[in-house]
C-alpha cells in the first residue's frame, strides 16, 4: 500500500477548528463538498451527494451529523453462512445506534463478512493517506491451515477485534465522517457498491498506476538510506513513546497469555475434582447428598473460571494485540511524514547545487571552458574538449547553460515551496493524528480494563454465592440430621 500519493489528501481544518474533536461540526460552510479543493488543486474526496441511502432530512454538509452526534457500533453474533458448501463463510452482526441525520434510521443492523471489512479498510487507507487508519486483525493463517476458522473460539475472537476496529473508526473525527463507512453500516446493497467501487479503483489504477508504483518504490528505497537533516523533536518523542508502549504491551501480552493458560488449567483441575467426587458417591452412599452438592459447586466454579478465561483470552488479550497493530499504523504514518521531509530537503539540496553552479559560471566564466586538465575539474575539461570537437562557441554554450540553470532554479524553487507546504501541512495532520490516537487509546484501555475488572468481580461474586449456598445447604443438612437422629 502507498502513503506517498498526496494528490488526493483531504487536509483538515486548522488547529482552532472544531473538527479536531470527536464530534462532527458544521464548519465547512464556505464551499460545498463538491467544490472543495486540496492544497494541490485537486477536488477533495467525498460528497454527500454520493450517498444514495442518505435520509430524507440529510444536509449536504451533514456527512455524519452536525454537532455532538452519536455514532456507536457493535460487532457480535458470528454465524456460519452457506454451511455444507464450498462457499461457506462467517458473517458478523453489525449493530449501529446514531442520531446522524445522514442515516435513514437511528438504530439498524446489517450482516457483514470479513472480506467486507477488508474492503472498507483498504479503501479508507487509500483515500485517507494522512490518517492512521486502524488496522484489521490478522488473518490467523494457522486457523485456516488447521480448519478452525469456523470454530466458536476463533470467530468470537475475530468478532471482538472487528468490534474494536469499527469503534476506533467511529471515535476518529475524520474517518467517522467517511461516506463509505456510512454505506458499510447501513446499505443493504453493499456488495453491489463494493463491486462498483472496486471496478473504479482498478480502472484508475491501470491508467497510471505502474509509473506511480515504480516512483514510490524508488523514493522509498532512496530515502531508506537517507537521514533527515533537521529532525523534528516532536515526532522523535512520539516515536520513542510508541516504541516504549509497544515494548510494554508485548511484555503485558506475554503475562496475560500465561494467565489465560493457567486459568484453563484451573478449569480442567476443577472439572477433574468434581468428577472424582462423583465417583465417591457409589462408595459412600450415606454421604451422597453432600458429595453431589460439593461436586455441583465445584463444577459451577469451573464454569465461572471458563467464562473468565474466555474473556481474558478472546477479548482482553486480543485487545492488547490489536493495540500493538494500531501502534504500527501510527509508526507507518510517522515514516511517511519523514519521507515527505526528506523529499523537501532533497529538493533544497538540488536547488542549492544549481544556484552554486550558476554563481560559479557567473563569477568565473573561464572555468566553464578551461583547457588545462590540471587546473580545471574533469567535467569542465571533458565538456570543453567535446565542444572543441563539435566546433561550439564556448561563450555561447556558457550563456545557454546559465539560461537553463536559471530555468531549472525557478522550477526547483516552485517545487521547494510546494514540498515545504505539503510537508508542513502533513506535520500538522500527524500532530492531530497522534492526539486522536492518544484519545482513542485512552478510551480503549479504559473500556478493556473496565470489562476485565467487571469479569473478575462477576467471577468472584459467583464464587462467593456458590460456596455460601453450599455452606447453607450443608448446615441445613446437618440440622436436619440432628433433628432426626434415628432416621
Curated annotation (Swiss-Prot):
Entry GO CC: cytosol; early endosome; endosome membrane; phagophore assembly site; phagophore assembly site membrane
Keywords, ordered alphabetically: Autophagy, Coiled coil, Cytoplasm, Endosome, Lipid-binding, Membrane, Protein transport, Transport
Residue ranges that the Swiss-Prot or TrEMBL entry lists as coiled coil: 395-430
Composition bias type Polar residues, residue spans: 20-32
One Pfam family in the UniProt entry: PX
GO molecular function: phosphatidylinositol binding
Binding of a 1,2-diacyl-sn-glycero-3-phospho-(1D-myo-inositol-3-phosphate), residues: 113, 115, 139, 158
Primary location class: cytoplasm
Job of this protein: Sorting nexin, involved in the separation or division of vacuoles throughout the entire life cycle of the cells. Involved in retrieval of late-Golgi SNAREs from post-Golgi endosomes to the trans-Golgi network, for cytoplasm to vacuole transport (Cvt), and autophagy of large cargos including mitophagy, pexophagy and glycophagy.
Record domain PX: where: 70-192
Membrane protein topology class: Peripheral membrane protein
The keyword Glycoprotein is assigned to this record: no
Stored CDD domains: BAR_Atg24p (cd07628), PX_Atg24p (cd06863)
Region (Disordered): 1-59
Similarity comment: Belongs to the sorting nexin family.
An example Gene Ontology biological process: protein transport
Free-text note regarding domains: The PX domain binds phosphatidylinositol 3-phosphate which is necessary for peripheral membrane localization to the perivacuolar punctate structures.
SUPFAM superfamilies named in the record: BAR/IMD domain-like (SSF103657), PX domain (SSF64268)
Places the protein is found: Cytoplasm, Cytosol; Preautophagosomal structure membrane; Endosome membrane
SMART domains for the chain: PX (SM00312)
Name by which UniProt lists this protein: Sorting nexin-4
Amino acid at each position: 500500500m502507498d502513503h506517498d500519493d498526496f494528490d488526493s489528501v483531504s487536509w483538515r481544518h486548522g488547529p482552532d477548528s472544531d473538527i479536531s474533536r470527536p464530534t462532527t461540526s458544521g464548519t465547512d460552510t464556505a464551499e460545498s463538498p463538491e467544490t472543495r479543493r486540496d492544497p494541490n488543486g485537486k477536488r477533495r474526496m467525498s460528497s454527500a451527494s454520493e450517498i444514495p441511502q442518505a435520509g430524507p432530512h440529510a444536509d449536504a454538509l451533514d456527512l455524519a451529523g452536525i454537532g455532538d452526534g452519536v455514532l456507536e457500533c457493535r460487532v457480535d453474533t458470528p454465524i456460519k453462512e452457506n454451511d455444507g458448501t464450498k462457499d461457506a463463510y462467517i458473517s458478523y452482526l453489525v449493530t449501529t445506534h446514531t442520531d446522524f441525520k445522514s442515516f435513514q434510521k437511528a438504530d439498524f443492523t446489517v450482516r457483514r463478512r470479513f472480506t467486507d471489512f477488508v474492503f472498507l479498510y483498504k479503501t479508507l487507507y487509500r483515500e485517507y493517506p494522512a490518517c492512521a487508519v486502524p488496522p484489521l486483525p490478522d488473518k490467523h493463517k494457522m486457523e485456516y491451515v488447521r480448519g478452525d476458522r469456523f470454530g466458536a473460539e476463533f470467530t468470537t475472537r475475530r468478532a471482538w477485534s472487528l468490534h474494536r476496529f469499527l469503534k476506533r473508526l467511529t471515535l476518529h473525527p475524520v474517518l467517522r465522517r467517511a461516506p463509505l463507512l456510512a454505506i458499510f453500516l447501513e446499505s443493504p446493497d453493499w456488495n453491489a457498491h463494493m463491486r462498483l467501487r472496486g471496478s473504479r479503483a482498478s480502472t484508475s489504477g491501470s491508467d497510471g498506476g505502474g509509473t506511480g508504483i515504480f516512483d514510490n518504490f524508488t523514493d522509498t528505497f532512496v530515502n531508506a538510506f537517507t537521514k533527515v537533516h533537521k529532525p523534528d523533536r516532536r515526532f522523535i518523542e512520539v516515536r520513542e513513546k510508541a516504541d516504549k508502549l509497544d515494548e510494554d504491551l508485548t511484555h503485558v501480552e506475554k503475562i496475560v497469555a500465561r494467565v489465560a493458560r493457567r486459568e484453563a488449567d484451573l478449569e480442567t483441575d476443577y472439572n477433574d475434582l468434581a468428577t472424582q467426587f462423583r465417583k465417591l458417591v457409589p462408595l459412600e452412599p450415606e454421604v451422597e447428598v453432600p458429595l453431589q452438592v460439593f461436586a455441583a459447586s465445584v463444577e459451577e466454579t469451573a464454569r465461572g473460571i471458563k467464562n473468565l478465561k474466555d474473556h481474558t483470552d478472546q477479548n482482553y488479550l486480543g485487545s492488547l494485540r490489536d493495540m500493538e497493530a494500531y501502534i504500527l499504523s501510527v509508526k507507518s504514518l510517522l515514516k511517511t511524514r519523514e519521507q515527505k521531509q526528506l523529499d523537501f530537503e532533497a529538493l533544497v539540496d538540488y536547488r542549492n547545487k544549481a544556484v552554486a553552479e550558476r554563481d560559479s559560471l557567473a563569477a568565473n566564466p573561464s572555468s566553464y571552458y578551461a583547457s588545462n586538465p590540471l587546473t580545471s575539474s574533469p567535467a569542465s575539461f571533458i565538456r570543453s574538449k567535446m565542444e572543441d570537437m563539435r566546433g561550439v562557441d564556448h561563450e555561447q554554450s556558457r550563456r545557454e547553460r546559465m539560461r537553463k540553470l536559471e530555468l531549472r532554479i525557478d522550477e526547483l524553487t516552485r517545487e521547494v515551496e510546494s514540498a515545504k507546504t505539503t510537508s508542513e501541512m502533513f506535520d500538522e495532520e500527524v500532530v492531530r493524528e497522534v492526539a486522536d490516537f492518544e484519545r482513542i487509546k485512552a478510551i480503549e484501555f479504559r473500556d478493556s480494563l473496565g470489562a476485565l475488572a467487571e469479569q473478575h468481580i462477576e467471577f468472584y461474586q459467583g464464587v462467593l454465592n456458590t460456596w455460601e449456598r453450599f455452606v447453607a445447604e450443608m448446615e441445613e443438612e446437618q440440622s436436619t440430621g440432628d433433628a432426626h437422629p434415628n432416621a
